Amino acid sequence: MAVSYNALAQSLARSSCFIPKPYSFRDTKLRSRSNVVFACNDNKNIALQAKVDNLLDRIKWDDKGLAVAIAQNVDTGAVLMQGFVNREALSTTISSRKATFFSRSRSTLWTKGETSNNFINILDVYVDCDRDSIIYLGTPDGPTCHTGEETCYYTSVFDQLNNDEASGNKLALTTLYSLESIISKRKEESTVPQEGKPSWTRRLLTDDALLCSKIREEADELCRTLEDNEEVSRTPSEMADVLYHAMVLLSKRGVKMEDVLEVLRKRFSQSGIEEKQNRTK
């Protein structure tokens, strides 16, 4: 079972006391009140830091004081990179909300993005059941790999075993994003003249009326699985059709599935009524 540090990280973010420049108070009463407020904030920070220290004490660090840390995209599920952390690196990540690691070669902390500005913004931190490995769950500002690839994992072992090196770099994608990648390739191919019968995806990409009519048709068939009390197995089948055709429309519009999932994530803590009121008209 994984343990989340999200609540603690949010508390630290809210409680930090940042003073942009020194304050001078001519009013003695005002100065007195401000001292009480700052002291209160200091006490809260001390209490929160004590919680952080307690959590860090429970991590099973190796004989060098390190643990493996894996960064994962909160929206796509893609594994971005893997590094090592010590107590200070994990503590810094929790407080700064930026993925921070420990460099074994330089024996120093480093924050992903400190030179490239491709930071990984941390939304949560998880520790595995044995408390000896960590997941940084967040959103990347850009490519994570120093090669410019989206993630550091783009070499398929099975492709190499099958001598299929012609396929080139291939990101480790989940089913949903593998489908998005295929649709994207079909979109690129649709600009090139083709002999013979085009694929169904290509037809949809080149015919807006057909695409929209299929989305409406498949959505209606999905609803009928409920209204007509069809076999339960029909529901995921029809939903797959809706999702596929909707993703073709997204590709046509230049919208990534990641953008959709980001919208959903941001709605988790917001009611539907509030969301509608805040929509840009």
UniProtKB/Swiss-Prot annotation:
<keyword id="KW-0368">Histidine biosynthesis</keyword>
<keyword id="KW-0378">Hydrolase</keyword>
<dbReference type="GO" id="GO:0005829">
    <property type="term" value="C:cytosol"/>
</dbReference>
<dbReference type="GO" id="GO:0009507">
    <property type="term" value="C:chloroplast"/>
</dbReference>
<keyword id="KW-0067">ATP-binding</keyword>
<keyword id="KW-0028">Amino-acid biosynthesis</keyword>
<keyword id="KW-0809">Transit peptide</keyword>
<dbReference type="InterPro" id="IPR008179">
    <property type="entry name" value="HisE"/>
</dbReference>
<feature type="region of interest" description="Phosphoribosyl-AMP cyclohydrolase">
    <location>
        <begin position="51"/>
        <end position="178"/>
    </location>
</feature>
<comment type="similarity">
    <text>In the C-terminal section; belongs to the PRA-PH family.</text>
</comment>
<feature type="region of interest" description="Phosphoribosyl-ATP pyrophosphohydrolase">
    <location>
        <begin position="179"/>
        <end position="281"/>
    </location>
</feature>
<dbReference type="GO" id="GO:0000105">
    <property type="term" value="P:L-histidine biosynthetic process"/>
</dbReference>
<feature type="transit peptide" description="Chloroplast">
    <location>
        <begin position="1"/>
        <end position="50"/>
    </location>
</feature>
<comment type="pathway">
    <text>Amino-acid biosynthesis; L-histidine biosynthesis; L-histidine from 5-phospho-alpha-D-ribose 1-diphosphate: step 3/9.</text>
</comment>
<dbReference type="GO" id="GO:0004636">
    <property type="term" value="F:phosphoribosyl-ATP diphosphatase activity"/>
</dbReference>
<dbReference type="InterPro" id="IPR023019">
    <property type="entry name" value="His_synth_HisIE"/>
</dbReference>
<dbReference type="InterPro" id="IPR038019">
    <property type="entry name" value="PRib_AMP_CycHydrolase_sf"/>
</dbReference>
<keyword id="KW-0150">Chloroplast</keyword>
<dbReference type="Pfam" id="PF01503">
    <property type="entry name" value="PRA-PH"/>
</dbReference>
<dbReference type="GO" id="GO:0004635">
    <property type="term" value="F:phosphoribosyl-AMP cyclohydrolase activity"/>
</dbReference>
<dbReference type="GO" id="GO:0009570">
    <property type="term" value="C:chloroplast stroma"/>
</dbReference>
<dbReference type="Pfam" id="PF01502">
    <property type="entry name" value="PRA-CH"/>
</dbReference>
<dbReference type="GO" id="GO:0005524">
    <property type="term" value="F:ATP binding"/>
</dbReference>
<dbReference type="InterPro" id="IPR021130">
    <property type="entry name" value="PRib-ATP_PPHydrolase-like"/>
</dbReference>
<comment type="pathway">
    <text>Amino-acid biosynthesis; L-histidine biosynthesis; L-histidine from 5-phospho-alpha-D-ribose 1-diphosphate: step 2/9.</text>
</comment>
<dbReference type="InterPro" id="IPR002496">
    <property type="entry name" value="PRib_AMP_CycHydrolase_dom"/>
</dbReference>
<keyword id="KW-0934">Plastid</keyword>
<comment type="similarity">
    <text>In the N-terminal section; belongs to the PRA-CH family.</text>
</comment>
<keyword id="KW-0511">Multifunctional enzyme</keyword>
<protein>
    <recommendedName>
        <fullName>Histidine biosynthesis bifunctional protein hisIE, chloroplastic</fullName>
        <ecNumber>3.5.4.19</ecNumber>
        <ecNumber>3.6.1.31</ecNumber>
    </recommendedName>
</protein>
<keyword id="KW-0547">Nucleotide-binding</keyword>
